[in-house]
Amino acid sequence: MNTLKPLIAAAVSLCCVNVYAADSASNAELEARIAKLEGNNAPSQFKNSQVSLYGSIRPTLSYLDDSQDDTWDVRDALSRVGIKASTEFADGWSAIAQGEWSVDIANSGNFGKARQAYAAIASPYGQVGIGKQRPAQYTLVAEYVDIFNHGNSPYAYDHDSPFFVDNFLTYQLVTGNLTWMAGAQFDGDKGDDATDMVNLGVGYDIDNLHIGIGYITQNTADQQGVEGDDKTLGGVVAYTFSNDLYLAVSYQDKQYNYDAGSMNKDRSGSTLDTALAYPIFDDYKIKLGYFQFKDGIKDNTSADYNGFNTTLEWNPVDNVRVHLEYLDKSYDNRDNDHAVTIGFRYDFSLTWHG
């Protein structure tokens, strides 16, 4: 009997040890499975990556007077949504993709045409992109006078200058205070078999000063199919003073040239856009602008115009803007336009890191 009790105690202890060991093994296996599942939630292709979803919704209500009729109209000041992703795959090397589409608030609220759609590789030697992108002429020149809450801003540049270019190959390099940009359009369905447009530009930034220069040469054709080429040389100077006064002036010289046999004559035109912004209270800002467009046509078919706008802007927070604008646009050969607009703008941006 004395021998039996120790044997029973030993058996019970052994069972407990086996159960504990089994539980420990099960726990270790469970933890390993959880770690594996958590790893599956972050696929390797998203490591060292960043994805941003962003947008800007900009409805407006305008009272329009073209000297003959006056109307009220809900319009849109270039609302858009977009997504941008980048992945660093080597030290200083990244792959980038971006898509951005307009939102047609003025009508049914549908997604409109693509504003940007491209892929790029960024490296210490510069960035190369292919697809629909911003040209140097806008990025380095026009953007600095594009401060107004209107779909046609900058008002002179808007008539006959590029905001986005499709079928576009671009290169960009930043060296110190200089930004170099080059782009070439290759559209096999129209224009030359080679390049249809070339845009070169350089920007200089130091402290509160920006100076930008851009040059465009672009293939064109008249209504009879006779080819020609347009050449544009433009520049901008923008400066923010110590009292937060912002002032920018942009000018472009435009040459319209046609080959022999064209009914159109060679001509010279220009665009002038100015922009001023000044904070008057903590959350309020006043904006002023003067603009002038000349197409070089010397008869009554000319679309020459000039004008000005004044804007009072309220920014209660960084991503919310409410504005009241008066726009006056005077044409040489057609009825003048006047508009009073109240508008709202809401910006958002969400970013995920892998």
Regions found by a protein language model. Name each.
Residues 2-3, 7, 14-129, 164, ...:
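Beta-barrel outer-membrane channel/assembly domains of diderm bacteria
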Residues 59-65, 101-105, 134-136, 175-177, ...:
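Transmembrane beta-strands of outer-membrane beta-barrel pores
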Residues 73, 156-160, 256:
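Extracellular/periplasm-exposed beta-strand and loop segments of Gram-negative cell-envelope proteins
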Residues 105-111, 160-166, 186-196, 224-229, ...:
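Solvent-exposed loop/turn segments connecting transmembrane beta-strands
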Residues 132, 140-175, 179, 185:
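Solvent-exposed adhesion/ligand-recognition segments of exported proteins
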Residues 146-150, 267, 305, 340-343:
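Flexible, surface-exposed loop regions and adjacent strand-edge segments
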Residues 197-302, 307, 352-354:
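Detector for outer-membrane/organellar transmembrane beta-barrel domains
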